[in-house]
Amino acid sequence: MTVIEFFRTVCEDIHSTVVATVDKNNLPVTCVIDIMDYDSDGLYFLTARGKNFYDRLKAHGYLSLTGMKGSDTMHSVSASIFGYVREIGTERLKTLLQKKSVYV
């Protein structure tokens, strides 16, 4: 499986993932986020200034995520990724919001 195929699986087949970050005391914190898009540079998701999740990402710059899809352990697929996070601004915002409307 190529990296782009892996990203496609996470985005399109799994979509909702559990993300781990650390807080200001370096204690682990998890939340569920939806992966909205992907390309050869990485995965894309939405958050906003003022949210604790956004603050943790800005403060530490790394996350770990895991997602699973399937009916049970023997009939499922899972994926785990860790890495650096960067803010991309508003350049992809319209596309991401359009994709989000499919899930709302």
Q: Where in this protein do the model-derived segments appear?
A:
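Extreme N-terminal tail/first-helix region
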Residues: 1-23
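Generic detection of intrinsically disordered/low-complexity segments and helix-coil linkers/edges
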Residues: 1, 38-39, 97
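Short beta-strand segments
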Residues: 15-49, 57, 63-67, 76-81
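Broad hydrophobic/π-residue packing in well-ordered secondary structure
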Residues: 10, 34, 43, 97-101
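Short charge-dense sequence patches
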Residues: 4-9, 44-50
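Short, structured beta-strand-loop surface elements
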Residues: 52, 56-104
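A generic local structural motif
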Residues: 3-5, 30-32, 52
